[in-house]
């Protein structure tokens, strides 16, 4: 089968002819229809420091996808051949304390599809049936293919009450932009998103952000005055991993504010803890999606009218995968879809 593999420990990703994966009694065999390129895939392509420490070589990459079930393990219940599915990319152990307590998103032994094991950039993917999620008929393939990053946005955004609240999002990557759309959809008052990439800020405006702020040219506190905000943001969603962005968030949070952190800093990050202490801030780390509450919320949000379509900006045939990676690496894109049909 065709597959995109991290074949060598250097920059790049390569089309290979890989053996069709073998499935176990509890697995599904999924024929991939569409995949999306994640920022993680770009890290793997670039072969940066994180990738060098994390990624086994060779390995088929990719973890954002939609496909069709074409075979079902003999112990599997609840899935049938022909089901349209995406899936949770965090394969959990099932036996640690958190797994046994039903908090599987906090499994300490997680293995990542397309990160620690072969992934979805292939004609076929084997996935434990536990991890699969049936896609409702009224959700198109393009949106189903980005459920993984959409789930990061939903998990982060819905960590705290948003109704009538003022929200600051630092980092206008696709996940931050989708989080802005979620916040507005569920009833936040002002949703302000910051970045220095004007292309991405324009996308955030299309997706409903109250204000998309280029911090290279605008002062965040001036924007707050413009919006009539007198006390600070109630909720912060840190999506960038950039220290200066987090520092700006701490400076502009209201007392008693709540911060959810998804962005991963490139190294250790010094912060002024006195601001957190004296403001009484609550900080929550976010990793992945809650299994499977976040997934049901994702489907329901789309079915209730949340429009994510502007975030998908490019489509390519899998044979043109290099063009897709070039678009993602340029920073001048939203989500990039690779078609496998």
Swiss-Prot record:
Binds 2 Zn(2+) ions per subunit. NAD(+) binds at residues 175, 195, 200, 262-264, 286-287. It is found in: Cytoplasm. Zn(2+) 1 binds at residues 38, 63-64. Its EC number is 1.1.1.103. The active site is at residues 40, 43. SMART domains: PKS_ER. Keywords: Cytoplasm, Metal-binding, NAD, Oxidoreductase, Zinc. The keyword Repeat does not apply. It comes from the Bacteria. Its cofactor is Zn(2+). Belongs to the zinc-containing alcohol dehydrogenase family. This is L-threonine 3-dehydrogenase. It comes from Shewanella frigidimarina (strain NCIMB 400).
């Amino acid at each position: 089968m065709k597959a995109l593999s991290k074949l060598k420990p250097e920059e790049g990703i390569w089309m290979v002819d890989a053996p069709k994966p073998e499935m176990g009694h509890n697995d599904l065999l999924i024929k991939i229809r569409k995949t999306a390129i994640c920022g993680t895939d770009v890290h793997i392509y670039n072969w940066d420091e994180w990738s060098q420490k994390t990624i086994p070589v060779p390995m088929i990459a990719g973890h954002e996808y939609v496909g069709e079930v074409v075979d079902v393990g003999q112990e599997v219940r609840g899935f049938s051949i022909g089901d349209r599915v995406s899936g949770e990319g965090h394969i959990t152990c099932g036996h640690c304390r958190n797994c046994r307590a039903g908090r599987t998103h906090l499994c300490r032994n997680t293995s990542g599809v397309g990160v620690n094991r072969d992934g979805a950039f292939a004609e076929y993917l084997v996935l434990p049936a536990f991890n699969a999620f049936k896609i409702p008929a009224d959700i198109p393939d393009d949106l189903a293919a980005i459920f993984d990053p959409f789930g990061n946005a939903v998990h982060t955004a819905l960590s705290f009450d948003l109704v009538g609240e003022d929200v600051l999002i630092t980092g206008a990557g696709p996940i931050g932009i989708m989080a802005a759309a979620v916040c507005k959809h569920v009833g936040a008052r002002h949703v302000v998103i910051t970045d220095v990439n004007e292309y991405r800020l324009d996308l955030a405006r299309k997706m409903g952000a109250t204000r998309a702020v280029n911090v290279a040219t605008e002062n965040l506190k001036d924007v707050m005055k413009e919006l009539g905000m007198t006390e600070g943001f109630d909720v912060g969603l840190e999506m960038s991993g950039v220290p200066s962005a987090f520092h700006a968030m701490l400076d502009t949070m209201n007392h008693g504010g709540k911060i959810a952190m998804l962005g991963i800093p490139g190294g250790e990050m010094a912060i002024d803890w006195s601001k957190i202490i004296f403001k009484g801030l609550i900080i929550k780390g976010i990793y992945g999606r809650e299994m499977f509450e976040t997934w049901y919320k994702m489907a329901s949000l789309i079915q209730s009218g949340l429009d994510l379509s502007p975030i998908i900006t490019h489509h390519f045939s899998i044979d043109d995968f290099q063009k897709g990676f070039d678009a993602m690496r340029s920073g001048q894109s939203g989500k990039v879809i690779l078609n496998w049909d």
